[in-house]
């Protein structure tokens, strides 16, 4: 058979195979066109589940007479005009294929009128070449599309249509999703001449919740937790049901929208599931209605024929943003249920941990008190039995968020005890009203050292060494194991018999460090790592860690944490002032003992006296 150009109707029918799956697909495409036209009211009339009639009427801007024929042509659209528009799509439709595809498998009639026109015009396509006929009609401002006898000329497609009830249920679900996306639009759905759904337009938040209850049901509304989460160009809002009270019926409510477009995105669902997994059973699913707003340049919606999926340019950032947003709401819900007697009273003044950046001249001074308790963090230091091989002698004292009042006198006495450090000149003295600090960052030297000033002395601090100690503190478990962060894509590695035996022997300790894995005959699958390792190249780091464990005869969490801290790659090949200040603030908060007794290689005093004497003798 020679190569030939397909007739327009056949080409459109082929395209319809991707766009028009069932009557619900037609309703989705046509209602989205109405929304793009600025409609505030859309009436959907269905007969026999959409097989006989689908009528969509709106009060949008309408289509001009001279554009009606183009509206039924392939690749004709008013949504985009250039590649730049395609890379930043803000409309629901943009391909210009829907009307042409639908008209090729049905008897479609398009009637429209703009506000500038005195009369409406009607267009329909027919014949092998899909010739468009335009004639006058009576119609208010807006557009009406009638789709009769869907799949009448493609018997194979019509044979696969389900029962009238099933097809209408799919249409009903599409309208529910659209109603959740656009609270400002009135949607009326009728079936066989009977009004089935009526979603009135609302504007205020209280009215939005009533419409949410009408769509998703009262049980969901009663358990819904509101979300408002923002970071840069990312915004997450909506509702998620309390996982502690999620029932089987609620798990069917899973609606997510990206820039107002309904989505079934696996990345979004995984982030939400991960945030709720601690409170959900193995057979439970989270219930949510969430809206993600993102810069259109950072998302590609042209990756699925029906536009059900998107591709994010920074998928890890979006995943973690959604995860943190949902998790923060669930944590706030948990905190609000705590009994009041278990909550310690708030302090009168909380000193800022900002010595590295300099004193805040705009801070409100604390009220004078007779004796202020020092703001020294509490940390555990003694050995405890039954810790599964964890060593505390010579280990890392893990910082805690604060200390109880009954321990205040003990720590006050400890702070008054004279120090016996062999190198007192390397210890930074405490500052009034603040916890001990390395001092103020003056500048960055050679890209990886910070020049510090404190109490009239100048010191050089190695930023990579400080970062390594901070990583070790973050990786060393305290009273509870390090929080594990599940991987979006688990890492599967082949291991030898010795490596597998070492992993099984150290599995409990690795679990305390936030590293979770499963092993089979010759492979190990890493499923979770601690937060400091999320941005590392795990395909290199994890095999090296397994090799290190295979060479050890005994295991301790401190030694494993030290090895990981020394072998992770720094995120800052060249340090900036802001990064150095942030690092020192974290080190002072999590590793206060480094300020009291800096280890070798961290701090080096700069002798100003010899330099000043040399200048004076010039």
Curated annotation (Swiss-Prot):
Listed SMART domains: DNA_mis_repair, MutL_C
Gene Ontology cellular component terms for the protein in this record: mismatch repair complex
Biased composition (Low complexity): 367-381
Composition bias type Gly residues, residue spans: 382-392
InterPro entries xrefs: DNA_mismatch_repair_CS, DNA_mismatch_repair_MutL, DNA_mismatch_S5_2-like, HATPase_C_sf, MutL/Mlh/PMS, MutL/Mlh/Pms-like, MutL_C, MutL_C_dimsub
Gene3D superfamilies: 3.30.230.10, Histidine kinase-like ATPase, C-terminal domain (3.30.565.10), MutL, C-terminal domain, dimerisation subdomain (3.30.1540.20), MutL, C-terminal domain, regulatory subdomain (3.30.1370.100)
Residue ranges of the region described as Disordered: 367-402
MF GO annotations: ATP binding; ATP hydrolysis activity; ATP-dependent DNA damage sensor activity; mismatched DNA binding
Pfam family, one: MutL_C
Keywords: DNA damage, DNA repair
Gene Ontology BP terms: mismatch repair
Function: This protein is involved in the repair of mismatches in DNA. It is required for dam-dependent methyl-directed DNA mismatch repair. May act as a 'molecular matchmaker', a protein that promotes the formation of a stable complex between two or more DNA-binding proteins in an ATP-dependent manner without itself being part of a final effector complex.
Xref: HAMAP family: DNA_mis_repair
Family: Belongs to the DNA mismatch repair MutL/HexB family.
Protein name: DNA mismatch repair protein MutL
